[in-house]
């Protein structure tokens, strides 16, 4: 039983996509996205420099571009399996999952992601102090619940930090005030010394996503979701105990999305300022639903890395 994984924001889509620009399907898909978004995605890719120290393009460009790149690669390099049973996206990657499962049209997803990115950028601009996101990874090869529990306890002592992503037993992402994030890094290094070394990485994003700081984005995103139509055809759905579900795992609940447009809209709205429970998403699709073949699509290697931390090996095409 197969599942496909899609990455979120923060991947280096520009240099990663350069080798694929000569592919006609990739070219046509990116051109299609450019017509919808009016963003020169291919120009950003062509002009990117390998190993550049320049920041990634702003959120309003990066989010639609990463969605477009993920779908371009899926179209150009279709999987060996004809149809995936499950679709799992990380944050922004959920929108790629909706397109791949044919629950959302490509053009509708691009418009919705553009609205999402603008709303999130607006929320970030309202913050009085600099905010960011910080990935905290325990480099020990032996996962332990003690690490996550230690981080949870430490975060409670910081007034301006939220949990943004729980990616695995060894990796968690924090969102919040940049000064407090700098402070908690040294605190955690001491607290987890007995468990292993700590590695911290700033995410190349423009704000504290998946946190309380995104609440001002709610109204604008809610309106955009309300204008978006989702395809909930019976052949896409699972039926369990008389209820219908989509084959897409929700970041908010780590369960299948209900086959109901209002439920979909509600969860995608919550996802903007709630933590991404990706560790549990992978656990659900593997342990509860028996997925044993995982494909990682989209630019970058983030999905392969997180899957590996969760004991899952992935196939990548390309």
From Swiss-Prot:
Keywords, in A-Z order: Acyltransferase, Fatty acid biosynthesis, Fatty acid metabolism, Lipid biosynthesis, Lipid metabolism, Mitochondrion, Transferase, Transit peptide
Subcellular location: Mitochondrion
Annotated Pfam families: Acyl_transf_1
GO function term, MF aspect, one: [acyl-carrier-protein] S-malonyltransferase activity
Biological process (GO), any one: fatty acid biosynthetic process
Source organism, top-level taxon: Eukaryota
InterPro entries: Ac_transferase_dom_sf, Acyl_transferase_dom, Acyl_Trfase/lysoPLipase, Mal-CoA-ACP_Trans/PKS_FabD, Malonyl_transacylase_ACP-bd
Enzyme class: transferase
Catalysed reactions, as listed in the record: holo-[ACP] + malonyl-CoA = malonyl-[ACP] + CoA
Major localization class: mitochondrion
Keyword Transcription: no
Pathways per UniProt: Lipid metabolism; fatty acid biosynthesis
EC number: 2.3.1.39
Any single Gene Ontology cellular-component annotation: mitochondrion
Described function: Involved in biosynthesis of fatty acids in mitochondria.
Family indicated by similarity: Belongs to the FabD family.
Name of the protein this chain belongs to: Malonyl CoA-acyl carrier protein transacylase, mitochondrial
Taxonomic source organism: Schizosaccharomyces pombe (strain 972 / ATCC 24843)
